[in-house]
């Protein structure tokens, strides 16, 4: 039996291109994360009654499509390899459509509808392109250390991109707006710049993985031929809807990961929507917010340097690393809520917690890659791309829940910006700190009791899958 698992053909180059692609993609998505709402109301000056069209409808469509993107990736014909094809085409279409979002059309309703339509189209293409990116650790390598490294690079690339975007975005927007004498051209110019970077980053990665994808296509074709021969049915060579369902509902580790990620994203997204309220109303230190955000971004960047140290410390055990790191964060949420230390102490300790707890979450993508290997081993069908596409579902659902919770909480509080900020001190303290701790604790418990794939087991399954393919081709 072959004891060599599949590895990256050129690890060094793949690592660099994978990191660059994630960095460039995050740069573009930061436009939406930080500026789409303020652009709509303060720059495009779209009436409040129409704002829900571009801000809410795309989120709903995005969540629904998150269940279909993996199926589209699997079933849709493509002239090149499916990963190379979507990495090349997806960013181009997405960047063009997203740039149109920041063009101000004269009629308010027309502008809102066009924004909505372009966001939906852009999301469709960049979501599938992102699925191909998140699939790389699962598709291109079975070596658990390489998967962990790719997962770490994805997380680090996102953190660095967010930090860089925070430094350059507003100066570019203001400079272009001042030169053109408009409120919107700066947003459009910045989106074009981010889109070009996004296209370049993904094209570089597409060219890098093409050779590995060809190797994978040969292995998949051999396995499909074996399965079709065994079933005496050509249709058996394709991934069926039943096999897709089995890949999720029959995959305990994947179900646990999905639920864990949902509550992890809720822990991040829900307080993100209340950051301004928390600093203004609960802490009474609005001027300190930028220091807090920048400091945490920097901590996320430097956490990548602790990642290899943690790998050695935990002897490559991803689950133990994640649980230990998350326990640090959970403890800090509850300690701060009940002790109520001063603002500067909160900022400093939060930055340190982000630094020392950050490496744990950098393994998330590697967990999904392991669950994809488990699905292929258990069902015999190559459903890895489909499984990796499910990585985005908890994220989309968390965004949807955040929108509902944010509106519900503000309505329940009868929030009035004209009142004394301290009026809302306790409610926003609860939402930002204690609710985050509760979400994080639930995620921790799900991972502790629901996920049981060890690195040794994943390696053994990968070898068995490889042996099946070898046997089918002889």
Predicted regions and their residues:
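Membrane-embedded alpha-helical bundles of multi-pass transporters/translocases
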Residues: 2-474
């Amino acid at each position: 039996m072959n004891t060599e698992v599949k590895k990256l053909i050129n690890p060094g180059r793949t690592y660099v291109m994978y990191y660059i692609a994630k960095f460039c993609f995050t740069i573009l998505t930061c436009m939406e994360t930080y500026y789409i709402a303020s652009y709509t109301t303060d720059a495009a000056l779209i009436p409040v009654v129409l704002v829900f069209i571009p801000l809410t409808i795309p989120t709903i469509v995005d969540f629904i499509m998150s269940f279909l993107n993996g199926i589209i990736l699997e079933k849709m014909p493509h002239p090149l390899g499916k990963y190379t094809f979507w990495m090349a085409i997806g960013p181009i279409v997405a960047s063009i459509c997203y740039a149109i979002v920041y063009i101000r059309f004269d009629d308010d309703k027309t502008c809102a509808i066009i924004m909505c339509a372009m966001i939906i189209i852009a999301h469709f293409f960049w979501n599938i392109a992102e699925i191909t990116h998140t699939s790389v650790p699962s598709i291109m390598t079975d070596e658990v250390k390489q998967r962990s490294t790719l997962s770490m690079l994805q997380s680090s690339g996102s953190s660095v991109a967010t930090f860089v975007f925070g430094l350059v975005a507003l100066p570019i927007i203001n400079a272009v707006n001042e030169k053109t004498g408009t409120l919107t051209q700066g947003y459009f110019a910045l989106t074009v710049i981010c889109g070009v970077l996004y296209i370049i980053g993904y094209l570089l990665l597409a060219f890098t993985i093409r050779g590995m994808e060809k190797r994978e296509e040969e292995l998949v074709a051999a396995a499909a031929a074996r399965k079709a021969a065994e079933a005496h049915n050509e249709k058996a060579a394709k991934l069926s809807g039943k096999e897709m369902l089995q890949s999720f509902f029959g995959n305990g580790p994947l179900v646990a990961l999905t639920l864990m990620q949902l509550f992890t994203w809720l822990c991040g997204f829900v307080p993100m929507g209340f950051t301004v309220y928390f600093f203004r109303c609960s802490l009474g230190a609005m001027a300190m917010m930028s220091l807090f955000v920048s400091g945490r971004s920097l901590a996320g960047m430097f956490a990548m340097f602790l990642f290899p140290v943690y790998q050695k410390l935990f002897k490559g055990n991803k689950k133990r690393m994640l649980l230990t790191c998350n326990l640090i964060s959970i403890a800090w949420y509850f300690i701060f809520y009940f002790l109520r230390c001063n603002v500067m102490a909160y900022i400093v300790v939060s930055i340190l917690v982000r630094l020392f707890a950050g490496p744990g979450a950098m393994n998330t993508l590697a967990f999904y890659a392991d669950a994809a290997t488990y699905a292929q081993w258990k069902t015999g069908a190559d459903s890895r791309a489909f499984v990796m596409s499910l990585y985005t579902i908890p994220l989309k659902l968390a965004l949807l829940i955040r929108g509902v919770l944010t509106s519900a909480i503000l309505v329940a509080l009868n929030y009035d910006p004209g009142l004394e900020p301290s009026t809302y001190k306790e409610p926003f303290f609860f939402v930002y700190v204690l609710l985050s701790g509760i979400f994080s604790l639930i995620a921790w418990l799900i991972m502790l009791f629901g996920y049981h794939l060890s690195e040794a087991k994943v390696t053994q399954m990968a070898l068995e899958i490889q042996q099946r393919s070898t046997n089918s081709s002889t």
